[in-house]
Amino acid sequence: MGRKVTVAVSTLNQWALDFEGNMVRILQSILEAKDMGASYRTGPELEVCGYSCEDHFREPDTFLHSWEVLLEVMMSPMCENMLVDVGMPVMHRNVAYNCRVAFFNRQILLIRPKMAMCDDGNYRESRWFTAWTKALQTEEYVLPRMIAQHTGQQTVPFGDAVIATRDTCLGYEICEELWNVRSKHIEMSLAGVELIVNSSGSYMELRKAHITSDLIRNASFKAGGAYLFSNLRGCDGQRVYFNGCSAIALNGEILARSQQFALQDVEVTLATIDLEEIRAYRVSLRSRCTAAASAAEYPRIHCDFEMSTHSDIFKTSTPPLNWPMHTPEEEIALGPACWLWDYLRRSGQGGFFLPLSGGVDSSSSATIVHSMCRQIVQAVQQGDAQVLHDIRQLLADSDYTPDNAAGLCNRLLVTCYMGSVNSSKETRRRAAQLANQLGSYHIEISIDSAVNALLSIFNAVTGLTPRFRTQGGCARQNLALQNMQSRIRMVLAYIFAQLTLWVRNRPGGLLVLGSANVDESLRGYLTKYDCSSADINPIGGISKMDLRRFLTYAKDKFNLPVLESIIDAPPTAELEPLQENGELQQTDEADMGMTYAELSQFGRLRKQSFCGPYSMFCHLVATWKSDLSPKEVAEKVKHFFLCYAINRHKMTVLTPSVHAESYSPDDNRFDHRPFLYRPNWSWQFKAIDDEAEKLQPIYTPSSAQLRPSSEDLLISTQRSSHLDDSKHSSPLSSASASASIDVGISTAAVPLPGAAAPGGLSKKPSGYSKVHVNVLGKIKDRTGIPV
């Protein structure tokens, strides 16, 4: 009997309900694993039908076609003399389960259902599947007749069991079970299971890849053994990007791993493991041996198969490797680009159309497309036949072979500067320079004639002509004129997206790309149905601060020097008239009444730390104590929640974007909230004001901690007593917390600091009046609600 086994984990780019394509990729992974000498192959979660079938999991067809694919795979000669398992949905006694189906030589050994559902973040598994709760138990599963006719089996074990070969034993966890507080791998390892297999559907979030590697290491470190982790990769039809990182670990060290980001549809990762290393490691852990001696016994399904052979002794065991992690800037460059590629090739469209303003956001979207082109060229040069086939099909050119990113970008990306009389020469110049350096097909248009045409219609009906604020108009007129420009750009974007390839004598149309970042979506700083309304958005899950860092990285990595001037330029929508000298008088942060750094912090506290208005104030009054007084913090928090509430409706029509940030306000699934709020948050804001009133007398900005004097404490106590006397009366009856929305943002006459330079806290004594007139005036007109 041998002592070394070669095992394979598969990273697959599957597509929901693409049963034919999914089967081909599964068979390809099995063939590659077998050719490389593996005796066992596993794959990702629900690889047969695709993970993101969602409510299609309620359709009998999905189960039927999954069994049909399993039959084709199981009967394939590729699988002979190899232990294989695949992921698919299985209905058992009228309950749907997410399962692994293990088979050997055309015989099903075990159907192992998932025992812990994931309902966090973008996951909603309990909507479609039920967790198997009968620990260490199996039941008889009656096979479909079409399967029984080929295998000769009528029933197979279904439940929580492990598979014992002649030389070792393997057991299963499925995705969430690794993250679960009661992970099954500990129980299995104590029961003598040496190879623990996890099929997963884990998606990308910035700065989170290390969590998976840490969990895999720890799973094999605590009680010894080999851990085989197989994950999906790519966009299979939803907003997430499954981020690969399949890996094999042994006794706390990573032996092999797949790429996190790649265009490969199939990547097989192997490791050769010495089983005696597992046994020696485990027996050396005395506390583990004590626990194992009294561990419950797992049901074992016996398989008459040796995963190792005597000749395997000549094989070299796979040594440990270092797992370097991508920086967040690299993750932005690679992840959304791969997601765009999957979406583009599976949508049947001919490329992208991007309104390019010359600012950070649209420049980031354009740079991500350029990164996609670089990856395509690299994959083709490395001999990836599937990528070459796909790009030729997209471009309707069977002889084309991309040899440089700029040339490919010229075919795939159309950028358009949509200027107006309010646009500056600087943004026009930056957009043109970036397009030239990227290689995109660039056009410039003016929207002024369209604006004038719409205004003439309005004037013909009403006899009135709205004016900008700088021209004597009110805030309502000013906002209407800005929104009209934005919406005209959206209409023009779709016209050019549909017809540009016709102009270029190519078939098909273009996907419109959006460029609204996660912070502006959270704040609602975008016009509903403007250029933020697109087919897809590569940066919708990324913060402004991260985009700036990404462009700094891309400037050198992709040789795009113009990005430096784009990063340094103040963010602006350019929707209001320029000053007489041609310079800007409108900036985003002044319009919003908060900096992007503050907005990012608000977003993380709201989503990641589950803070409502009062909890957020309590957190920030300590975090910002060296810069802002309690009352100033209170005004900022209230301003954010007011803006969030009255703009929440915009999230219901937000353009689909790749999920990347853990505080995303994506309404589709990740962030479920009402879209009709009471915008003045009367009860919550009164709680903030009361607390700020207590803290203000003892506030010392230069202190590391609040150190109230005896006199301050006495005054604070007296004030608290006064407030306590009235605490039983409804705060709605007080002047500072009126039920009427007319109370505005503030319930205390404290100036709100204005905007500072990007990336810092804002603190200007005269800022509140500017925010109140400029920002709240726009909010009032945008929603029709007086605030």
Swiss-Prot record:
Active-site residues per Swiss-Prot or TrEMBL entry: 45 (proton acceptor), 114 (for glutaminase activity), 175 (nucleophile), 357
SUPFAM superfamilies in UniProt: Adenine nucleotide alpha hydrolases-like, Carbon-nitrogen hydrolase
GO molecular function, one term: NAD+ synthase (glutamine-hydrolyzing) activity
Enzyme Commission numbers on file: 6.3.5.1
Residues making up the signal peptide according to the UniProt record: none
Superkingdom classification of source: Eukaryota
Pfam family, one: NAD_synthase
Domain CN hydrolase: 5-275
Gene Ontology annotations of biological process type: NAD biosynthetic process; NAD biosynthetic process via the salvage pathway; negative regulation of neuromuscular synaptic transmission
Classification via CDD domains: GAT_Gln-NAD-synth (cd07570), NAD_synthase (cd00553)
Record's keyword terms, sorted: ATP-binding, Ligase, NAD, Nucleotide-binding, Phosphoprotein
PROSITE patterns: CN_HYDROLASE
Residues annotated as binding ATP: 355-362
Catalytic activities: deamido-NAD(+) + L-glutamine + ATP + H2O = L-glutamate + AMP + diphosphate + NAD(+) + H(+)
Record region (Ligase): 325-787
GO CC terms in record: cytoplasm
Record pathway: Cofactor biosynthesis; NAD(+) biosynthesis; NAD(+) from deamido-NAD(+) (L-Gln route): step 1/1
Residue numbers of Phosphoserine PTMs: 703
Family annotation (PANTHER family): GLUTAMINE-DEPENDENT NAD(+) SYNTHETASE (PTHR23090:SF9), NH 3 /GLUTAMINE-DEPENDENT NAD + SYNTHETASE (PTHR23090)
HAMAP family documented for this protein: NadE_glutamine_dep (MF_02090)
Family affiliation: In the C-terminal section; belongs to the NAD synthetase family.
Known function: Catalyzes the ATP-dependent amidation of deamido-NAD to form NAD. Uses L-glutamine as a nitrogen source. Because of its role in energy metabolism, involved in the modulation of aged-related cardiac function, mobility, and lifespan.
Entry protein name: Glutamine-dependent NAD(+) synthetase
Species the sequence originates in: Drosophila melanogaster (Fruit fly)
Gene expressing this chain: Nadsyn
